Amino acid sequence: MSLSVEAKAKIVSEFGRDAKDTGSSEVQIALLTAQINHLQTHFATHKKDHHGRRGLLRMVSRRRKLLDYLKRTDLAKYSETIARLGLRR
């Protein structure tokens, strides 16, 4: 259910400051968003996967906390990140 190495590398290069920047908030938010989108398609077909749904809710909560941190520290990057990812806020 995780993302492929190529997909992660593409996201890191797109949102990171350089090719090895995996720790910045923008990259972490983008990776979590990709995983969440992937899992949403999984739950469309596997409606009774309650254990997996708990993991999805943890990811959503973690993304929410990272977005709150980014908004608190750098409002311009926050606005740019949610616009590029198409998140509503």
From Swiss-Prot:
Recorded hits in InterPro entries, A to Z, give: Ribosomal_uS15 (IPR000589), Ribosomal_uS15_bac-type (IPR005290), uS15_NS1_RNA-bd_sf (IPR009068)
Q: Can the keyword Transcription regulation be found in this entry's annotation?
A: no
Instruction: Note the superkingdom of the native organism.
Output: Bacteria
Concerning PROSITE patterns, the annotation shows: RIBOSOMAL_S15
Arranged from A to Z, the UniProt key words for this protein are: Ribonucleoprotein, Ribosomal protein, RNA-binding, rRNA-binding
**One Gene Ontology cellular component annotation held by this UniProt entry:** cytosolic small ribosomal subunit
Q: Which SMART domains match?
A: Ribosomal_S15 (SM01387)
Cited function: One of the primary rRNA binding proteins, it binds directly to 16S rRNA where it helps nucleate assembly of the platform of the 30S subunit by binding and bridging several RNA helices of the 16S rRNA. Forms an intersubunit bridge (bridge B4) with the 23S rRNA of the 50S subunit in the ribosome.
Record family assignment: Belongs to the universal ribosomal protein uS15 family.
The name on file for this protein is Small ribosomal subunit protein uS15
Origin organism is Haemophilus ducreyi (strain 35000HP / ATCC 700724)
Q: Its gene?
A: rpsO
